[in-house]
Regions:
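Assembly/oligomerization scaffold segments
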Residues: 1-170, 206-227, 232, 260-269, ...
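Acidic, small/polar-enriched beta strand-loop surface segments
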Residues: 2-53, 169, 177, 217-394, ...
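Low-complexity, flexible helical/coil segments
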Residues: 70-72, 166-171, 183-188, 401-405
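Surface-exposed intrinsically disordered loops and tails
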Residues: 98-103, 198-206, 242-245
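N-terminal export/assembly leaders
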Residues: 158, 176-210
Length: 405
């Protein structure tokens, strides 16, 4: 089995792009110069170095906690024990030091990827992004450690700004593609997964994108008009989903607390007034005519709770009114908001299923409730909005999913 074993969880790999070939045959080298070895080959095959054997903990956060939140950059952090000093950026003898360029191979903005191998030895990515910062901690009289902070490619979009952009009236998905194709953005075409949008965006003078507009901020505005999802997938693709409806995709995993299906060890439940929206106001760019949707019955019970969008990219007042109606959520609903499980509780097949659940997937959560002598079970199918992984080489892998109806 490839990768490094993590207790009661499976085999994993954590790879960092060093900027130079890591497995090339080197003449006269005591390790890389051995004839007929299979690890170091002529010309080499990869710039990525596996560092998991020096890591003691990894934390990944992706997506959002609630459907009403905006998606931000996914993050990963991990801590390495530098017992041999090879992660020291000043060590020119480190195997990760690029002697040809006279610079550390482990450096900010290098590519990084975390993966897990299934029981069939299939490599599945859990996070793909770039390194943002190395925090090296020199411990006098103890072990040096390096904490590495990473972000997915939303971080790159958040650091990029547009030139003035004259837009055309087009579907939201076409606008996303047009922005990503701009020369100042140049987002790779092969790492996009863009569904056809349902909403038309404006193309008049009022919708011209001014110079200096942040790319991620503008794409978030596009998604606000569409009311879909815009996020980076676990394998590094930019995903744009169309407006979310009332029908979910088939469930990819069933979590139960009664000893059947996939077990879990934590569930969040909410039933609160903050869920209510009984007045929605949407105003498009260039219009002085805000579109308002009200639910008088809900306002009588829960007071007026307003959701307002004042600079919508939608093309017409009619579309703005449709969005205002869509945003109404007049009655609070008791629902499961999160679910946590530990891989130590799961079978090998269940671990394979749970590891690859991604934002936008549907899961089923069933919980047993006891009242007196009666036990009832309540199951809900919910969409995954956010994911948190915690991996510790000594205690294993645990995961939390944040959900929406």
């Amino acid at each position: 089995m490839a990768g490094t074993a993590v207790v009661a969880s499976g085999n994993y790999d954590l790879e960092i792009d060093t900027g130079f070939v890591q497995d090339a045959f080197l003449l006269d080298d005591a390790v890389a110069g051995l004839l007929d070895n299979t690890q170091y080959v002529l010309d080499g095959t990869t710039d990525f170095a596996s560092v998991l054997d020096g890591v003691n903990s990894i934390s990944v956060r992706r997506g959002r906690r609630d459907q009403g939140d905006q998606f931000s950059a996914g993050t990963m952090s991990f801590t390495m024990l530098d017992t041999a000093g090879i992660f020291n950026p000043f060590d020119e003898n480190s195997p990760y030091y690029d002697t040809a360029e006279a610079q550390p191979g482990l450096a900010p903005m290098r590519r990084v990827r975390l993966s897990r191998y299934s029981s069939l030895n299939v490599k599945e990515y859990l996070f793909v992004g770039v390194i943002v910062n190395y925090d090296y901690n020199f411990a006098l009289g103890g072990l040096d450690t390096v904490t590495v902070f990473c972000a997915d490619d939303f971080y790159l979009l958040a650091q990029t700004y547009l030139d003035e952009f004259n837009v055309s009236e087009e579907l939201s998905s076409a606008r996303v593609t047009a922005v990503l194709d701009l020369p100042e953005v140049a987002f790779p075409a092969l790492t996009r997964d863009i569904a056809t949008g349902t909403q038309t965006l404006g193309g008049s003078a009022a919708f011209v994108v001014p110079q200096g507009t942040n790319v991620l901020g503008y794409l978030s505005d596009v998604n606000e008009a569409e009311q879909g999802r815009l996020f980076m997938s676990r394998d590094g693709d930019l995903v744009f989903d169309a407006r979310l409806g009332t029908t979910l995709t088939p469930s990819v995993a069933d979590f139960h607390d009664d000893g059947t299906n996939i077990p879990y060890n934590g569930v969040g439940i909410t039933f609160e007034a903050d869920q209510v929206t009984n007045r929605a106001v949407v105003q498009i760019l260039g219009s002085n005519n805000p579109q308002v949707a009200d639910d008088a019955g809900s306002q009588a019970k829960y007071f007026v709770q307003t959701y307002s969008i004042t600079t919508s990219l939608l093309h017409s007042d009619s579309a703005a009114l449709d969005l205002a109606v869509y945003l109404l959520d007049p009655e609070p609903e008791a629902r499961y908001t999160s679910l946590a499980t530990s891989f130590a509780l799961l079978s090998s097949a269940q671990r394979d299923t749970v590891a690859v659940i991604d934002v936008g997937d549907t899961i089923t959560i069933e919980k047993s409730f006891t009242s007196g002598v009666t036990t009832t079970e309540l199951a809900q199918e919910l969409a995954v909005e956010g994911i948190e992984h915690t991996i510790n080489v000594n205690t294993g892998h645990s995961v939390t999913y944040y959900t929406s109806p």
